[in-house]
Amino acid sequence: MTIAVCPGSFDPVTNGHIDVITRCCRLFDEVHVVVAVNAMKKPLFTETERVDIIKHALADSGMTNYVVAWTDGLITDYCRKVDSPVIVKGLRQNGDYEAELGMALVNRHLAYVETMFLPANPVLEHISSSVVKDVARHGGDITGMVPDYVVPLLEKALR
């Protein structure tokens, strides 16, 4: 059985994230969606809230072969813990490759974990958590950028 780890800050989870996660679920026996705590970021939602939001967002996906968790450690340590040989990351056209390639090389060095890149769905590639938060902060419509469940939660968090 091959387990893949799909990490991110997911603050908030976007439809782009959900697309990558569901595609990943079609490719692997089990997918661990891991909310990674990034000390460099100040999240709107706690780790537990993000885990719950992702679980709710994936509930209607038709996928059942996923686990949602969080870690404040290295993703490679999480991979070792669950015996996963691969990390899966989505790539947009905005320079994600350069940033993600560096991390992929570090992850391989640390734990011999490979990184697989899935290109973003062209319809969703302009969406990022940062853009969603910025649009929502300014009263813009984020419908279609995030799962419907996230819209009121984000609006409340930004009040």
Curated annotation (Swiss-Prot):
KW Magnesium (keyword) present: yes
Matches recorded under SUPFAM superfamilies: Nucleotidylyl transferase
Superkingdom field: Bacteria
CDD domains (alphabetical): PPAT
Localization annotation: Cytoplasm
Pathway(s) served: Cofactor biosynthesis; coenzyme A biosynthesis; CoA from (R)-pantothenate: step 4/5
Molecular function GO terms recorded: ATP binding; pantetheine-phosphate adenylyltransferase activity
Residues where substrate binds: 9, 41, 75, 89
UniProt cross-references to Pfam families, sorted A to Z: CTP_transf_like
Cofactor(s) named in the record: Mg(2+)
EC number: 2.7.7.3
Assembly and interaction partners: Homohexamer.
Protein family: Belongs to the bacterial CoaD family.
Protein's UniProt name: Phosphopantetheine adenylyltransferase
Gene name, Swiss-Prot/TrEMBL: coaD
